[in-house]
């Protein structure tokens, strides 16, 4: 055993490589062992340090891979599972357990997160040389019972299936202990580099090999001062020093100091010594000069995007200044990889800098995983419509075009069908010939055929199920779709998709291994496949060696690259505080470590945090050979952040913080990096003058659209794709002639009028362009209203010989049997329940009709208007016609006065403010239309709410009181003529505010005609402004702004062009109610009509 240490500015790899070459010269075979995260990088570093640049006798590898290079004899032929296979095994065993058998984990026993944690615990216990039976020492009885039961079941299953347990390293340990290694240990040497601690498993391997006579050389970074200090707690080198002291004590071998004498202390050595003295409380006087500040720079940036742009510019500039440099001389370290990943690609592509981020990507969100998830959902939830749509949207199932998929989705949404039997029936329903049923049935068969074959599979052997799955992938054109999708991609993306496919196939291979010979149902297979894919990860390798490597800062080693940029070094990211997210708490780990024998040790992350983070900071400061840039943004993930305390310490030593900003106000030689980056800088430069006054704008895109829009306006140009504010064009004369020929009647409905005054452009979309809502065959508010209307229409038309209740029940029975309503309300249990609710509403509403002797109904569903009688005459002589349908016309028995009733599904009242602004013209329009047809004597126009009254029992003292209060809400709401009100009974809400004199009645009709005239003139002129109304002057109601995606209107930007409702001019603090409010609005109407 030979232990070495060196100062951090001397390359430990060079020293250990020389040791390795000397051992090779002595006839030894050398295994150069590096940590998992550094093994590939270390291989290149060792090759660069070798005098011959290569050696067949030196193998750079990891502890786990050593077994590959040693000859192991008489080992049982067991198949080794990786994490995917192990996850499948856990999933299977947990699925077989009854949730009641697990006291803690029963409810989440098949949750992917739990399975992932169980896998991690499995590996952790293997690495720590701990047996699962050691879990008996847990104090939590429920958790102990659950974990023991799970691991016992998984272990039994692995043994039964001849599947290897434990890691590759544990198999090597077992082979050495049982003398199953035939390799000559005297010819083997281990050189170990880059470790500051061994796991229990790694230490066991070193111990066994040392006992077999294998020569071992272990090196680490440490200063002589730290190594010889009697107190190392809190020292920067604490991790490596404790590691060396432990090994020296165990193997009775003092560590040798291999530090080199440097002619001059460089900037990074100076910073290291200052940091070390700060942490060991010793005094050290070193001056930091301008050269040091140039070599080790601390940047303070505003945002993460700005950081990346500054780094990209700096790299480009250095490459421009020195032709000997290449991309491989640069390294980028990230404080938080996930936060920078997307911006990194965008900005580095813009600056044309090739980079490689060596990070595994999860398959959980890949379309292939969503494809499997959708098929599982189809099987598990018995062919839900949404699951089939999700399957088609992956673009992996069948070779149908996007237009075919859209047409199929639209039709099945129209039908509202669920369940395989419903999809197996031939499509026959069409809405007035809107759908191409022949084509849709062809699509239905193409989509269903592969799924039907697959879903017909019964529980069978895993091998047979995999064959059927393979056939399904071919028949469903999944492999073909993947190939077609990748052919149009760039080479890098094609490689990425190839890795995804490999990962997918690997999950299937592991499934075949774990379930070989077992009977598996299709649903279990799909669930296992989805679980395996959710756990899977894939990664690509760089296409060329000459790239900028990007990695997390905590994986860095000293002297890694010439130029290193470490960004995102905020207080939250540096240092990284490891959190324990496993199934065992730190306290439980401590108890297990105390209860087990020596050498068996679970890692307690919190106890390692301080020494690990200090050593990481030391490695970070020494990661560069020439220049190091440490940066922290003021805004990190859109939240304010502070720079790391370690950076503040360096500033305290004399290094300077540099405020770095992207300057778009001028161009400099630093912008001459690449064509794309220069173009971007020019665009930003020309925008700067416009953008300087718009700091409140939320997004760059909105700012950009305004800037370009203004530029175009100045030059008399127009780009409809990026308007400065949403606007519409007046329709051309020939278009208007085609829409509204002079000889053809122009019709305007009351609903069209309301839509026009809500938002003129909404009227254009719905009534001119004919924009429709998506069709639905299932019952909706419209069908509910028609159903109730039909019941009352029929009930009131039946002869009076029978009681009203009998007539109502007969009407309910006959209406329910009509083909239209029978098809809708018998389709599903949900529809049947809806029908029962509607019938309750009908019976409740019938109460008003049953007990109202003062009136008689003379007409139901009465049509009004038409070409015979113009509603209004425009100034140009053109007539405007109004036609519609009144739900019911009543007549007072006393004097024959006419009243109009409109059924509503919710409480609706006539409101003068809304009427004045064109938003409540329904009742006046009905009265005006009937008056033009010759009716002269009216008692009113009103709404009847068709709903069950709801009464809070807390607000009344008794049930009788609740009945009284409920009856109050069941009244006709609307407008009534004052002279007829005495004839109306208790069912009419005839307070003074709702009663009109003859003069007020005529004024109401005249103003209503005025509203129609204004709207008709604008419509016939082809002018439709984008002007949704605002009631409070601050926002737009959602039902008013239904077409935002089309118009682009945003209330927070374009409120100025909204239509502000006209209101009464009241003195401050004055509030009118009742009849005074009515009189005030009539006064305003007179002003508007100049009367």
Curated annotation (Swiss-Prot):
Signal peptide: none annotated. Heterodimer of AddA and RexB. One of its GO terms (molecular function) is ATP binding. InterPro entries: ADDB_N (IPR049035), DNA_helicase_suRexB (IPR014141), P-loop_NTPase (IPR027417), PDDEXK_AddAB-type (IPR038726), Restrct_endonuc-II-like (IPR011335). The heterodimer acts as both an ATP-dependent DNA helicase and an ATP-dependent, dual-direction single-stranded exonuclease. Recognizes the chi site generating a DNA molecule suitable for the initiation of homologous recombination. This subunit has 5' -> 3' nuclease activity but not helicase activity. This is ATP-dependent helicase/deoxyribonuclease subunit B. Belongs to the helicase family. AddB/RexB type 2 subfamily. Its EC number is 3.1.-.-. Pfam families: ADDB_N, PDDEXK_1. HAMAP family: AddB_type2 (MF_01453). Its cofactor is Mg(2+). Keywords: ATP-binding, DNA damage, DNA repair, DNA-binding, Exonuclease, Helicase, Hydrolase, Nuclease, Nucleotide-binding. It is an enzyme of class 3 (hydrolase). Despite having helicase-like domains, this subunit does not have helicase activity. It comes from the Bacteria. One of its GO terms (biological process) is double-strand break repair via homologous recombination.
């Amino acid at each position: 055993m030979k232990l070495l240490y060196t100062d951090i500015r001397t390359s430990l790899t060079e020293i250990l490589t020389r040791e390795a070459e000397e051992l090779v010269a002595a006839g030894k075979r050398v295994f150069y062992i590096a940590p998992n995260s550094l093994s590939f990088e270390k291989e290149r570093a060792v090759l660069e340090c070798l005098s011959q640049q290569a050696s067949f006798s030196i193998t750079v590898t990891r502890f786990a891979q050593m077994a590959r290079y040693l000859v192991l004899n008489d080992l049982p032929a067991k198949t080794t599972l990786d994490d995917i296979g192990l996850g499948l095994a856990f999933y299977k065993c947990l699925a077989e357990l009854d949730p009641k058998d697990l006291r803690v984990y029963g409810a989440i026993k098949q949750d992917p997160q739990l399975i992932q944690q169980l896998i991690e615990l499995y590996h952790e216990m293997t690495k720590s040389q701990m047996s699962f039976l050691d879990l008996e020492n847990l104090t939590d009885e429920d958790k102990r019972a659950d974990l023991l039961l799970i691991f016992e079941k998984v272990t039994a299953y692995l043994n039964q299936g001849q599947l290897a347990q434990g890691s590759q390293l544990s198999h090597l340990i077992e082979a050495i202990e049982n003398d199953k290694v035939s390799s000559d240990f005297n010819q083997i040497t281990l050189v170990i580099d880059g470790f500051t601690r061994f796991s229990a498993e790694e230490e066991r391997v070193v111990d066994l090999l040392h006992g077999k006579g294998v020569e071992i050389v272990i090196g680490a970074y440490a200063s002589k001062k730290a190594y010889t200090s009697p107190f190392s707690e809190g020292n920067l080198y604490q991790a490596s020093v404790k590691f060396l002291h432990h090994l020296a004590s165990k193997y009775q071998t003092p560590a040798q100091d291999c530090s080199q004498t440097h002619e001059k202390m460089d900037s990074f050595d100076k910073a290291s010594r200052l940091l070390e003295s700060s942490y060991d409380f010793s005094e050290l006087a070193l001056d930091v000069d301008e050269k040091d500040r140039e070599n080790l720079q601390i940047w303070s940036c505003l945002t993460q995007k700005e950081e990346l742009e500054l780094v990209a510019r700096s790299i480009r500039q250095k490459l421009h200044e020195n032709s000997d440099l290449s991309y491989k001389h640069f390294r980028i370290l990230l404080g938080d990889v996930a936060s920078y990943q997307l911006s990194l690609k965008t900005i580095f592509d813009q600056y044309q800098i090739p980079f490689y981020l060596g990070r595994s990507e999860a398959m959980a969100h890949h379309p292939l995983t969503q494809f499997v998830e959708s098929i599982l959902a189809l099987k598990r939830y018995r062919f839900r419509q949404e699951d089939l749509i999700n399957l088609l949207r992956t673009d992996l199932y069948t070779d149908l075009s996007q237009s075919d998929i859209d047409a199929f989705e639209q039709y099945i949404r129209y039908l509202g069908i669920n369940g395989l039997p419903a999809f197996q029936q031939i499509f026959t329903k069409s809405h007035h010939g809107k759908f191409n049923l022949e084509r849709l049935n062809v699509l239905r068969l193409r989509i269903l055929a592969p799924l039907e074959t697959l879903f017909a599979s019964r529980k069978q052997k895993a091998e047979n199920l995999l064959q059927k799955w393979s056939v399904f992938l071919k028949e469903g054109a999944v492999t073909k779709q993947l190939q077609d999708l990748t052919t149009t991609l760039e080479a890098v993306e094609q490689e990425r998709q190839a890795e995804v496919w490999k990962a997918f196939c690997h999950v299937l291979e592991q499934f075949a291994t774990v379930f070989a010979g077992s009977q598996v149902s299709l649903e279990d297979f799909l669930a296992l496949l989805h679980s395996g894919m959710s756990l899977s990860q894939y990664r690509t390798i760089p296409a060329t060696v000459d790239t900028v490597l990007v990695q997390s800062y905590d994986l860095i080693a000293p002297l890694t690259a010439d130029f290193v940029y470490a960004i995102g070094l905020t207080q939250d990211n540096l240092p990284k505080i490891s959190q324990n997210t496993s199934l065992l708490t730190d306290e439980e780990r401590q108890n297990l470590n105390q209860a087990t024998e020596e050498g068996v040790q679970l890692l307690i992350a919190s106890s390692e945090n301080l020494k690990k983070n200090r050593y990481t900071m030391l490695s970070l400061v020494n990661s560069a050979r020439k220049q190091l840039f440490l940066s922290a943004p003021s805004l990190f993930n859109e939240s304010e952040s502070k720079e790391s305390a370690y950076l503040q310490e360096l500033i305290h030593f004399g290094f300077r913080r540099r405020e770095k900003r992207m300057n778009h106000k001028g161009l400099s030689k630093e912008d001459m990096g690449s064509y794309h980056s220069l173009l971007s800088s020019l665009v930003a430069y020309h925008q700067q003058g416009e953008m300087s006054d718009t700091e409140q704008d939320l997004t760059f895109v909105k700012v950009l659209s305004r800037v370009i829009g203004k530029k175009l306006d100045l030059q008399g140009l127009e780009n409809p794709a990026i308007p400065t504010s949403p606007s519409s064009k007046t329709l051309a004369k020939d278009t208007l002639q085609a829409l509204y020929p002079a000889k053809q009647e122009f019709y305007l409905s009351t609903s069209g009028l309301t839509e026009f005054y809500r938002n003129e452009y909404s009227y254009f979309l719905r009534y001119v362009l004919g924009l429709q809502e998506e069709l639905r065959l299932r019952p909706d508010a419209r069908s509910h209203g028609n159903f109730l209307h039909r019941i009352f229409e029929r009930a009131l038309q039946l002869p009076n010989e029978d009681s009203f209740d009998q007539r109502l029940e007969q009407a309910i029975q006959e209406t329910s049997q009509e083909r239209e309503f029978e098809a809708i309300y018998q389709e599903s249990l949900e529809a049947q329940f809806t029908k029962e609710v509607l019938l309750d509403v009908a019976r409740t509403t019938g109460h008003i009709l049953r007990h109202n002797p003062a009136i008689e109904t003379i007409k139901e569903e009465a049509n009004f208007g038409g070409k015979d009688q113009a509603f209004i005459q425009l100034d140009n002589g053109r007539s405007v016609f109004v036609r519609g349908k009144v739900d019911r016309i009543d007549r007072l028995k006393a004097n024959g006065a006419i009243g109009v009733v409109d059924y509503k599904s919710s409480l609706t009242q006539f409101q003068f403010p809304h009427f004045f602004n064109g938003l409540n013209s329904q009742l006046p329009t009905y009265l005006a239309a009937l008056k033009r047809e010759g009716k002269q004597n009216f008692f009113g126009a009103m709404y009847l709410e068709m709903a069950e009254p709801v009464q809070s029992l807390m607000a009344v003292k008794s049930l009788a009181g609740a009945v009284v209060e409920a009856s109050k809400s069941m009244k006709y709401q609307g407008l009534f003529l004052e002279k007829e009100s005495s004839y109306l009974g208790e069912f009419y809400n005839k307070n003074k505010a709702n009663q009109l004199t003859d003069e007020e009645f005529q004024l109401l009709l005249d103003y209503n005609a005025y509203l129609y005239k204004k709207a008709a003139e604008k419509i016939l002129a082809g002018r439709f402004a984008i002007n949704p109304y605002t009631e409070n002057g601050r926002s737009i109601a959602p039902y008013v702004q239904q077409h935002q995606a089309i118009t682009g209107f945003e209330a927070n930007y374009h409120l100025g062009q909204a239509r502000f409702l006209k209101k009464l001019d009241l003195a401050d603090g004055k509030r009118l109610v009742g009849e005074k409010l009515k009189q005030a609005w009539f006064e305003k109407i007179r002003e508007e009509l100049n009367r």
